[in-house]
Amino acid sequence: FASFENKISLYKKPLRLVINTSGFLHSNHIKPEKRLSHINRSNIIKNFTINAIAPILIAKSIEKFIRPDLPFSFASLSARVGSIGDNRLGGWYSYRASKAAQNQFLKTLSIEWRRKFPLSIVSILHPGTCDTKLSKPFQSAVPKDKLFTPSQSCEYLIDIISEQKPSDSGKFLAWDSSIIPW
């Protein structure tokens, strides 16, 4: 993250918006676990490193570039499957747990930044199911009107981010602005 901080320091204006879009569900060699017997340590570590640890380290890296007297938004893509209260299907252990961990990190961050940066907003956003490599193997179960292009999803999320106020900081929201249970 040092090179990331160095690049930000070259930007001479205060940060106003950072959007984290990193995420990992599967690769050619790693599949989401359907049952307990599929869990292995390296898959858990990879999911947590990208989905939970990276977003909070990004926040840590940018904190020194935020001014308390200016509005600032930090938005991070999470996933509905990271909701403990909304888990009806089970499976996908590492992905679900890593997104739930991201949600906790960012909810906690929103409380700290409310004190340090009263005009800041931390947004935890579910973009919906997008027609990308991440969701491609699982799209057959998604209704056509709920499978978004990346551009559609971006429009929905930018609308949410642009309409939020500091009092909205720390909420877990879906692409349609509905609140997702923790």
List each model region and its residues.
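Conserved Rossmann-fold cofactor-binding substructure of NAD(P)-dependent oxidoreductases
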Residues: 1-14
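Short-chain dehydrogenase/reductase
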Residues: 5, 59, 106, 154-157
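Conserved hydrophobic beta-strands of the Rossmann-like cofactor-binding core
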Residues: 14, 18-19, 23
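Hydrophobic structural elements of the Rossmann-like NAD(P)H-binding subdomain
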Residues: 19, 75, 122-125, 135
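Catalytic loop of short-chain dehydrogenase/reductase
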Residues: 24-28, 32-53, 63, 67-116
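Conserved Rossmann-fold SDR core element
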Residues: 103, 113-130, 168-172
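C-terminal helical subdomain
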Residues: 124, 132, 136-182
